[in-house]
Amino acid sequence: FKKQNMKKKSLSAKKIIHKSLLNHLKNKKINKVYNYFKKYLDENCDKKTRFGVAISGGPDSLSLAFLTKCYAIKNRIEANFFIVDHRLRKNSTKEARSVKILLNKYDVNCKVLVWHGQKPKSNIQGIARNHRYNLLKKICKKKNISHLLIGHHIDDLYENFFIRLLRGSGLKGLSSFGEPIKEENNLIILRPLIKCKKEDLIYISKKVFNFFIKDPSNEDSFFLRSRIRKLIIDLNKQGFDNKKLDLTIRNLKFANDGIDYYVKKNITNNSRFIEDKKTFIINKYFFKQTQEVVFRSISIILRKISGRYYQPRGKSISDLILKINSIKNKKITLGGCFIEKINETVFISEEK
């Protein structure tokens, strides 16, 4: 009887929490963001989707936690929330715990994933990002989660555009950030806030939780992203505003979609995937397409074989294609893949 009574009290407390969360949707500003979020998920998921949600403690991810929880309550579906503790800063474990405790009060139960092992001294953000996605992918596979939600917003989209431009990215890299990505094991990575402004997400975090963590690296000019952020502010002052940037990205996307058609055709017609050996066999016609089609085709294959969220840098892929075209028999490793050319045939498998 006591157990039943406690269960009833627990359910009653949950209902009160859920009602309080949903009441925030009456706020016009919050409701506008939620409606965009809902539309995005409705278009990319079905009603039985199992969500994983990546949380950090910043305003973007806390807003994502709130919006996903509201969506889960309304649609009676399950959402799993994950915090990654990179242990790169002294206070990271304490911060992860405080975010977990805070969200638990709102019936958002988080699991903390810890990155163990040696920490990098260079390319810190890039290496941390790869480890973060690997941890998230593993837990999603373990829990049979089909969709992982990430809190990237439109400011991230602009920053990534310039970062990729500086690194010499091609059309694909400049226009594809923010699109759904299908990983191995059929995990789909979604960015449902990609058209939302950071200032709106800060507003939601303050209104709902009255809390968010400021990442000191965001203001540190040691990191490229921080310098890019300042560059965008300067460009806005010079007249290259966000509307013009949106138009540029949209035009690049139209051109990109046309090339994608030929990339899919190239992979289908000129390569074969042997699933049990996790190996691609590529014929000589694969490399006789236009440069951009070959580049993208090989990039897709490298990502599929390695299972890594991010592919190798563009220069490394271009160098690989050059070596394949210039040497008959060659063995190369790149991005977690083993590439071997025998006569006119190329084999790409997982690096052991």
Regions found by a protein language model. Name each.
Residues F1-D60, E78-F82, H86, W115-P120, ...:
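AMP-forming adenylation/ATP pyrophosphatase catalytic core
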Residues K7-L231:
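Core alpha/beta nucleotide-donor-binding catalytic domains of modification enzymes
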